[in-house]
């Protein structure tokens, strides 16, 4: 950082960031990031990448300084100069007048979840299929790897990615996830031990 810890905050915080919170609209079945507040900040991109995903590739890192916000948690995110900042750590300065944040510079996209039927019980306690409605939500797609499978009749290309979502977005293996009109992905693996986010290994295949 170009300033020391004793630098006057007014001269340090010469930029602006939007602090984003996740909101849910029940009528439209949509989760979306909305601005909680806009505040002065100092932001610089890091020379080191940020390992924000346990299963995906790294992203460019950023360091952010803001005045102390007691409500801020890693469940939130930020937007700076049109860039989405996925928060990965929050530290309070020794003077307790500012917070030093680490973030990954990512692209947040809107996706549609199409959950598969769940198994429930009817009035007679017999297993029955329970329809789960679809919903839209924001997520970050990061690359995992590509693989080519040779089959008897045709060759299929299998594309795997890692989907990183806010913690409240709960998917199961077998659920479908789609971005715009692209072919949908199928959730293959759920990684949900992190207290602030969920990760899903998703894949799709098509004839090459």
Name what the model sees in each region.
Residues 154-173:
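A conserved acidic, glycine/proline-rich C-terminal tail/linker
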Residues 67-72, 166-170:
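Short, surface-exposed secondary-structure edge patches
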């Amino acid at each position: 950082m170009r300033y020391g810890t004793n630098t006057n905050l007014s001269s340090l915080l010469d930029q602006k960031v939007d602090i984003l919170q996740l909101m849910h609209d029940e009528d439209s079945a949509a989760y979306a990031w909305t601005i909680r507040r806009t505040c002065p900040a100092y932001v610089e991109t890091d020379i080191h990448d940020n390992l924000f995903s346990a299963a995906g590739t790294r992203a460019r890192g950023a360091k952010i300084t803001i005045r102390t916000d007691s409500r801020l948690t890693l469940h939130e995110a930020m937007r700076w100069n049109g860039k989405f900042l996925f928060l990965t750590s929050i530290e309070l300065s020794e003077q307790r007048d500012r917070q030093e944040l680490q973030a990954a510079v990512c692209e947040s996209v809107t996706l549609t979840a199409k959950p598969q039927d769940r198994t429930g019980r009817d009035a007679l306690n017999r297993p029955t299929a329970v329809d789960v409605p679809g919903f839209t939500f924001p997520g970050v797609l990061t690359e995992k790897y590509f693989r080519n499978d040779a089959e008897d009749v045709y060759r299929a290309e299998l594309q795997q990615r890692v989907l990183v979502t806010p913690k409240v977005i709960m998917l199961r293996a077998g659920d479908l996830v789609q971005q715009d009109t692209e072919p949908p992905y199928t959730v293959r693996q759920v990684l949900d031990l992190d207290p602030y986010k969920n990760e899903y290994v998703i894949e799709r295949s098509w004839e090459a």
